């Protein structure tokens, strides 16, 4: 298929005052796509089609936990020139090999689980909350729900008790699918809820946990996944297939600001999104591929891509962020090197970690080998950009060793969830395989825009073209100075089509603000029309701040560039109308920082690189060095002068979803971080570096 086939076109006579043209994929210029094929209009249809088409082929694999090892290790650090011994609890895991089940088996299991739910009183008139880690059991139970037209409700593992109760109460969930280790977080909501009657555990909970549930909610029955499966086989029920307009899922957003909202996704929305993604990527991802499944299934990105994989006939390999690498397992390989995926999906934070890991290994090499790597990287990028031969030879000599860390056979990576720095995309696409940026939201069923593998280097720093099941336009934002009649056109991205959701549950004001009467969803993202009618994202409307001199600063754009630094584990930018430039709050990468300080000791930093992280973060010399590093990156990436930070605040603890500094999809919670460091931010503005 020719590259030009993926271009999108302006819809004739569609331009209105204050708006751009309406753009569509060339594949859907006449009519938007709403299915991958005739006869598939629901998730249950998808399951049946997958079993029919792929039969006894491997569908998904999982690893059994053999042993969990906990040990206390001593770490020696120097504090004020004295050695201090710190104790830290380390957990490692011993896992078995991947064990696989076929597409026919997935179908059989799903029908049995659906039967078991009906036998337990869970029907299409109720809902089932999924509050668990990503696993084959999660996915097959959800498929079981679809076989009986039972709507599911998704909640992140990191959701607090208030959020769990809200989702239970709003959706009137009668059943919960969960993991034993998450049961304690359910006790509070169970005490409040009158709806829940059944808890399905992915594995057998301890007697203590069972007693806790019984004492908290005596009317709630606990059953294991295996026992539910057996019950369904003993009491089989005929499938009760859903209709296209039935609710498939209430998917709760991760809530980077405010209260999580339940996005109402109909079966036809999910199938339309799958149809659009399939039209673009099925030329490249197929029955021969192995896809690593480790992102939260409560996130639309993972949810939709697993549905796509089911349809394509690829193999899903379930994994955990805790056991991805060889470093966190014993007597076995990590999930990446054991499963050896050919396709990897991830959020920018994952790809930044991979890049930093590669660079850390390179920096430990002798100087001549570092030069070989750097020269080979530059040469390969040159060859790719000009479509010249020679890349395979460079892979064989230099880059295959890098690829081995991800299993050695990756063909494509797909990035979503937030903006990926163009430099990171180019680096990994040269070292490992093409990294394809995409863009979508929960409200649009994820992949609304994507680049095809042969296009990544042609349309750098864009999110690609619209899939054939949506159309989009830009709308003026006068308050921020973005206009669609500028060159290039800029404005808020609005999306419409069969993949767009049915609104938010019980949020009339939010629905009124986000959706128009003629079906447009206002994404809140600011974009511009780039080369070939691709879409380039600028930032979220809420993250664009007017500075002292009246110019606007896009905070996420700044963060995406600084995230690439080996000194940075995470970053949050702040700007306001009282200052001309931003301040950046940095959670340092501890190993990267200590290595950097060792190499640069004696400049503005005269302390001990092995001091505690807390002391290093308070050190003005360290602050100066990190600020200098960020300023240099900003200049290299051609940030505007108003986007170059004027100060830095260093955070001495890891930002996680558990401590409420990140969402479950690893986006920074800006309001929380800024509130926590408000005093330090003002001090950073007052310093003269």
Swiss-Prot record:
Q: Where does ATP bind?
A: 252-263
| Membrane topology recorded in Swiss-Prot or TrEMBL | Peripheral membrane protein
Which EC class heads this enzyme's classification? ligase
Cellular component GO terms held in the UniProt record? endoplasmic reticulum; fungal-type vacuole membrane; Golgi apparatus; lipid droplet; plasma membrane
Q: Which CDD domains match?
A: LC_FACS_euk1
Q: Which cofactor does it need?
A: Mg(2+)
Residues forming the motif FACS are 518-567
Instruction: For this UniProt record, give its keywords in alphabetical order, as a comma-separated list.
Output: ATP-binding, Fatty acid metabolism, Golgi apparatus, Ligase, Lipid metabolism, Membrane, Nucleotide-binding, Vacuole
Under InterPro entries, the record lists:
AMP-binding_CS, AMP-dep_synth/lig_dom, ANL_N_sf
User: Cellular location of this protein?
Assistant: Golgi apparatus; Vacuole membrane
What Enzyme Commission number(s) apply to this enzyme? 6.2.1.3
Please give one Gene Ontology molecular function term for this protein: myristoyl-CoA ligase activity
State the similarity comment. Belongs to the ATP-dependent AMP-binding enzyme family.
What is recorded about the protein's domains?
The FACS motif is required for catalytic activity and substrate specificity.
The task this protein performs is described as:
Esterification, concomitant with transport, of endogenous long-chain fatty acids into metabolically active CoA thioesters for subsequent degradation or incorporation into phospholipids. Plays an important role in the determination of viability in the stationary phase.
- The identity of this protein, by name, is Long-chain-fatty-acid--CoA ligase 2
The species this protein belongs to is Schizosaccharomyces pombe (strain 972 / ATCC 24843) (Fission yeast)
